[in-house]
Amino acid sequence: MKVIFFDAAGTLFHVKGSVGEVYLHYAEKYGVRRTDESLSALNAAFRRAFREAPPPVFAVSDPTEIKRCERLWWFDIVHNVFYRVGMFNRFDDYFEEVFHAFGGPAHWALYPETSGVLKELKDRGLELGIISNFDTRLFNVLRGLGIAELFDTVTISSLAHAAKPAPQIFRLALEKHAVDPEEAVHVGDSIGDDVEGARLARLHGVLIDRQRMDSGEHKPSALQVLTIRTLNELPQLISTL
């Protein structure tokens, strides 16, 4: 192997608490009451809205326009969430606060092993990259979490004009490293976006299954998916490929 690619959120780092908790934290000042029921409803509504959203791919190239499209994409998702659980006055002001809050490291945290594993892989002489459907705020998040300098490339959907699981975004990432698909691994927490997407582009796909999704239609073993529980298992797995 020459290059190891990673998904970002859910693979290298995670939201502190839950998205619903962050949404509710900022919504309280706008009169939204915090209860166990409202938190549960927000988390469920976010999962549904995010799942139903179109891919974050836009027919623009100007950096300012890309950021505008990203903001509108997220506005639709957050508006959809509160349309389901209860809208409130000054929603536009609220959205600006939440969108900005997720654009820095304050509400994100690295998984405990992330930095150590990335450094170990770099010490082996491997190149590292990110392939993510995150938006351009990712660059600031990576800097804030202290891992930006560990990556040789970062490929995101809004700049690549393609989103996982489409093979195009993987191929663009490969071109940046000038390697063949068989010389690269992609690690992520989604069977569809990450593992199947990587396979479509002929990379080695690895599922990081922190939640131990061992049952149901997406059972990793049933799909013969290379699976790890934490990033600590990745260096050994790579040695076998």
List PLM regions with ranges.
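Asp-based, Mg2+/Mn2+-dependent phosphohydrolase catalytic module
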Residues: 1-4, 14, 37-40, 88-93, ...
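N-terminal helical cap/lid subdomain that shapes the substrate entry/recognition surface
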Residues: 1-112, 124
